[in-house]
């Protein structure tokens, strides 16, 4: 055996020596042949060559070397020449560069695609597309200009994370630590099949998250005791402000005072005070005992239950008195508390708001979290935000959809109930799954444990001789002491954060992560160094209940089987994946929604979002404990200022619509500071996003609408006349650039000058910033303020309808007015001189801080050149698709040189006359091809707006174009009379398996063609799970909670009978 092994080794060695000798011989006699490598470094379309230039591989300044493969091979092992020339230092640098992973087109593809559009190079296409008058020479960063590699980025984020100090938080105030169930963390929060989905406008390919959001609504209605809920709002503070607006609308604006009880969270009070200005409402803050309605001018009142300092009060008589005076009652509440407390609906509350954060969503230094708003059926059409409803599909089977969309900004514009667009769908889904996982008994057990720990703590403090509030409480204990600050400082030394209410009052709020050991540590802190003769465990048997008997919940909740079935990890895992399989996401195919920028959400960008050093910080923790976050904020602010040409940024707005509102409020504050109280006119193009007029209305501005010319550009003459007519009262002009028509308007700098010459400020909607970065900038163009949709241009995923971020950048003269916060003072980044902040826009000082690392890592890894290239490739991809499709569909708008920006509009209006086909039919048929439809009928009715982004490969662009071309041929069959106008493959789309596999098939086309209209679908196909959903039926028969299990079964049986 040993002899055989030696012989085998000797033979191997002989062979290797022979090969080495032959290689040396080849090296000396040939300069044209190369030795193959175990990986490819050749071919102009290689992903590796495209990101590492030839000059890097051969050494800068050298002539091309056709022997790169062999030369590199000299250090790869036996069989390659060892005496070859040395490799360049550049080639030894890290290879995990990011731009080549994000920007999909290779250099060879870029050239060929540009040529197909009629240009020699990508740069010549961009030069013809972006007006020369607004082009930047270059963009350079102070930090990260060359871009970090993915590995370097992770190390940098680890360094930042190490600078955050996660102390045990007892601060409360609406933010609590929670155990995120790992099955939910891994399979929803970290799962691109959930976080890369878009808002479920296309219901047939969104049934999974629609069901989860319906679970969320059912959870909210059950716990609050009110019959209607929306599918999430941005945070508790803004939800309260929305409720205040509802009260104003319910009273038809006739009563102009809104009272807020002093037991509400300070951030909620501040947001309502800020928001009230736009509605000309007077906000009065009073102690509960001092509230009266003698003025007859009160539209509503807001109370907290439990109160911000922990008290649990009986609001029965209070609400009766309010109703007797025709005053609506808003109650801010806590979902975990409502599992054991009498629900607000049983008191008679009209509206209930709150946050679902402590249902399995980390604090994240402030967000994102899903807020909620529940109300009665009477006020359903005045509710803000998305609402999920039950309807039926074309076969009569139950199907879900977004209900009552006519309330929303994209339809009603300035008459909408709210400017809300992006909400917090991903976080609502996490919270709903938390309730599904724990069920009613599990939630009640958590609540009772939290209450018990708080009660044991209160008992212990009494034994230590401290004064504890004698009112009922749930999870927060209020303590009177001679020196609150000294106790808080002592707690910090033990890595504990408490809330200091005033010099003599301190509170401690408990949550599901609190342990008996934590309570013992608190005893030592409050004992001030004196020995403690008891433990939390020893006191436990003495505690009974601190909730007044009349306020203990008796009514059942979460009785539906969904909340009582999936309590093991296997069962919940399968339920999550069953829902996930019903939804199309970026995991399946491109989502070419115009003005939505559904680009890559890279894994490296997402990783830090789940690290405890980022997730577990309370937003009101001392900033000394969040130095990693603060460094990131400062770096990000500097990067965004460079990208936009602005002087300062606020990171507080936690949605694009919130950014619009904040920017307009900053403009308003600027005018007021100059004594221009009369400047309240806002000019808005008719083609603007619906959020623009809705936001302007919220600020109290009067809206003047101007039109566009035949080429889709803003009518400059009409704008000039409007600006001059209103020059004495002009406040702002809102503009999107490139335009919502997908064109770089040549006169944009002239437009800005017209507004400035007439005393107004220019607000730029940053929705299309993906076509500006590195090529031009809002500040360079002439804008005064702009919000950025970080969930578009800067890679925060859309999450199926949120989260998002809408930070605003401003010029120097507006910087002093950027938002602040009542608990942790904030302002612009970098900080302006002489700040005069306007108040809070969001509940947390830095908005949804937890998702800012996504945009931060994207910018830092791309570097200035990578970002510039991304903008160029986004333009290239759109023009390539427009060129491929122009022979089949008219491209509606183009720039002066015949090109489009990063998106374009195809015109389908003619097909209604020739074939009875509308954009909805095309969008539904695209589902059969495995695609999400483009943006329908906006900004022009009867059209589709397509935005490919820079992240999609040429192969994917071609696949989508092929689908649309194939659909055009299907339309032609109708036009020729070969297919029935009313019964054809487009009108019948989409075709779910339940329809295709039914016993009976009555369609005039084959099942095979309905299901597999393209060859690529046979390899892998995403299946719609329902037929076309009936929107009219859903609104006429409005049901916004889970149907009783028995009813659902009966309806499904009837539909299949």
Curated annotation (Swiss-Prot):
Ranges annotated as biased composition (Basic and acidic residues): 18-27
Tagged with keyword Oxidoreductase: yes
Gene Ontology biological process terms, A to Z: glycine decarboxylation via glycine cleavage system
Localization annotation: Mitochondrion
The protein's enzyme class: oxidoreductase
Tissue expression as described in the entry: Highly expressed in leaves. Detected in roots and embryos.
SUPFAM superfamilies named in the record: PLP-dependent transferases
Single GO MF descriptor: pyridoxal phosphate binding
Reactions this protein catalyses: N(6)-[(R)-lipoyl]-L-lysyl-[glycine-cleavage complex H protein] + glycine + H(+) = N(6)-[(R)-S(8)-aminomethyldihydrolipoyl]-L-lysyl-[glycine-cleavage complex H protein] + CO2
Gene3D superfamilies: Aspartate Aminotransferase, domain 1 (3.90.1150.10), Type I PLP-dependent aspartate aminotransferase-like (Major domain) (3.40.640.10)
The organelle targeting sequence, given as a residue range: 1-86
Compositionally biased spans, kind Low complexity: 28-47
Induction notes from the record: Induced more than 4-fold after exposure to light for 6 hours.
Cellular component, GO, one term: mitochondrial matrix
Needed cofactors: pyridoxal 5'-phosphate
Region (Disordered) location: 18-47
Family, similarity comment: Belongs to the GcvP family.
PANTHER family the UniProt entry points to: GLYCINE DEHYDROGENASE (DECARBOXYLATING), MITOCHONDRIAL (PTHR11773:SF1), GLYCINE DEHYDROGENASE, DECARBOXYLATING (PTHR11773)
Subunit structure: Homodimer. The glycine cleavage system is composed of four proteins: P, T, L and H.
Protein name in UniProt: Glycine dehydrogenase (decarboxylating), mitochondrial
Organism (species): Pisum sativum
UniProt lineage: Eukaryota, Viridiplantae, Streptophyta, Embryophyta, Tracheophyta
Gene name as annotated: GDCSP
